[in-house]
Amino acid sequence: MKLSPKAAIEVCNEAAKKGLWILGIDGGHWLNPGFRIDSSASWTYDMPEEYKSKIPENNRLAIENIKDDIENGYTAFIITLKM
């Protein structure tokens, strides 16, 4: 699912509340219709074995990445979560 910047940040916040790890974020451009991913706007954060205590930090970094991408003109995002 492609997400608006606001929705992507909301997904990160909800993931933190539910204890879900954000594995990656891919930024791109919404073309109406369609989505063009930009491989230079891809963020990943390796999940350590003892990841539960690091979920807040992981999700904070994910949100910071989205905000940086917004400043660089990206308008849509795909988020990959670890259930």
UniProtKB/Swiss-Prot annotation:
GO-annotated biological processes: bacteriocin immunity
Keyword field: Bacteriocin immunity, Plasmid
SUPFAM superfamilies in UniProt: ImmE5-like
InterPro entries hit by this protein: Colicin-E5_imm (IPR020127), ImmE5_sf (IPR037234)
Function: This protein is able to protect a cell, which harbors the plasmid ColE5 encoding colicin E5, against colicin E5.
Record's protein name: Colicin-E5 immunity protein
Gene designation: imm
